[in-house]
């Protein structure tokens, strides 16, 4: 098995910063330093994850073929388990209408977004000016408090420029 050490190092750093950021979130009101560190991490960490996801999505056919198995099914499973967990903690009765497939709980939005981006990438890649167009769409979402689906659609559109930027990025560009 060939391991790309730079990829592993970059992902490890981002995951470490994400965990650190979530830890800092609990204490940011108690310390100015922690609040500043929290803000520094949150300025770029999701954008970097999305950019890397786009960068590692060069094979558009494979992306579409594996999107359901790699992203949608885990999303459904973990979103449902999160729904069960929240219902258990809150003592809420389970109901068919309580679980909403397209309303991701917490961080599940990222799996849902990856599924959408991977499914749409082959079509997006055919659009000549997709990067500037995605930037305009991303900025446009800022004009609305929500596009629906509990902010999932807003996040999908607003992070699309980073995904497409990663997809279009070539190492020779550095």
Task: Please name every model-derived segment.
Residues 6-13, 126-137, 150:
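Membrane-interface starts of transmembrane alpha-helices
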